[in-house]
From Swiss-Prot:
Keywords: Coiled coil, Growth regulation, Tumor suppressor, Ubl conjugation pathway. This is BTB/POZ domain-containing protein KCTD21. The lineage of its organism: Eukaryota, Metazoa, Chordata, Craniata, Vertebrata. Residues 3-72 form the BTB domain. InterPro entries: BTB/POZ_dom (IPR000210), KCTD11/21_C (IPR045763), SKP1/BTB/POZ_sf (IPR011333), T1-type_BTB (IPR003131). It comes from the Eukaryota. Probable substrate-specific adapter of a BCR (BTB-CUL3-RBX1) E3 ubiquitin-protein ligase complex mediating the ubiquitination and subsequent proteasomal degradation of target proteins. Promotes the ubiquitination of HDAC1. Can function as antagonist of the Hedgehog pathway by affecting the nuclear transfer of transcription factor GLI1; the function probably occurs via HDAC1 down-regulation, keeping GLI1 acetylated and inactive. Inhibits cell growth and tumorigenicity of medulloblastoma (MDB). One of its GO terms (molecular function) is identical protein binding. Highly expressed in cerebellum and brain. Expression is down-regulated in medulloblastoma. It holds the Pfam family BTB_2. Homopentamer. Interacts with KCTD11; KCTD21 and KCTD11 may associate in pentameric assemblies. Interacts (via BTB domain) with CUL3; indicative for a participation in a BCR (BTB-CUL3-RBX1) E3 ubiquitin-protein ligase complex. Pathway: Protein modification; protein ubiquitination. Residues 88-112 form a coiled coil. GO terms for biological process: negative regulation of smoothened signaling pathway; protein homooligomerization; protein ubiquitination; ubiquitin-dependent protein catabolic process. It comes from Homo sapiens.
Length: 260
């Protein structure tokens, strides 16, 4: 049995065998480790490859097993495909093509489920009436929560590109708030009467906007209308069994489906 070989791939170290690296002789790795191509070394004497080290684990596992094993929430398909092209592991390239066709079919049929919650709470704040003169005030504030689940990761990304939080006078995309590729939780408030703009920032109160309409979402009715526009344009339709179509705008749980 040959001695282990340690690779430095983009700063990540992997240890494997010569037999594994040459298991596909026509690949770039097969050529590198059969002496047909020169190899570079790092300062520790490890074989250095200036490529992405994170996804190389999936390439190495394929060399070991001839099977493509990816986690269910894998989000680096484009990167992995480019790396497979670089290493020229043809069976892996074909396996990735089959996987992408499978994912594409799964994306066509989809479900969208939205759970809405609303409450009213009192917010306390200070108001500057004159230089060095402040008064305490309070006002009722509507707080909204929406839990969104979709079997289509692409739709949630589309939705995330349309909705923005307003905080500290700036709009920021909600895509950074994705819990995972299939879940999104939104929390925001309506405009509060008499609340100074700086208090929204001080109390971490976010408002929600939809673009490109540049419309602030101050009620669930507006939220549902805007999400519905986006969903219908992406092929979704209202699930006739839940809720009843006549009561759609007033329901706290909304379900849409897509068949293609």
């Amino acid at each position: 049995m040959s001695d282990p070989i340690t690779l430095n791939v983009g700063g990540k170290l992997y240890t494997t065998s010569l037999a594994t690296l040459t298991s596909f002789p026509d690949s770039m790795l097969g050529a590198m480790f059969s002496g047909k191509m020169p190899t570079k070394r790092d300062s520790q004497g490890n074989c250095f490859i200036d490529r992405d080290g994170k996804v190389f684990r999936y390439i190495l596992n394929f060399l070991r097993t001839s099977h493509l094993d990816l986690p269910e929430d894998f989000q680096e398909m484009g990167l992995l495909r480019r790396e497979a092209d670089f290493y020229q592991v043809q069976p892996l390239i074909e396996a990735l093509q089959e996987k992408e066709v499978e994912l594409s079919k799964a994306e066509k049929n989809a479900m969208l489920n939205i759970t809405l919650n609303q409450r009213v709470q009192t917010v306390h704040f200070t108001v500057r009436e004159a230089p060095q003169i402040y008064s305490l005030s309070s006002s009722s504030m509507e707080v909204f929560n929406a839990n969104i689940f979709s079997t289509s990761c692409l739709f949630l990304k589309l939705l995330g590109s349309k909705l923005f939080y307003c905080s500290n006078g700036n709009l920021s995309s909600i895509t950074s708030h994705l819990q995972d590729p299939n879940h999104l939780t939104l929390d925001w408030v309506a405009n509060v009467e008499g609340l100074p703009e700086e208090e929204y920032t001080k109390q971490n109160l976010k408002r929600l906007w939809v673009v490109p309409a540049n419309k602030q979402i101050n009620s669930f009715q507006v939220f549902v209308e805007e999400v519905l526009k986006i969903a219908l344009s992406d092929g979704f339709c209202i699930d006739s069994s839940h809720p009843h179509a006549l009561d759609f705008m007033n329901n706290k749980i909304i379900r849409l489906i897509r068949y293609r």
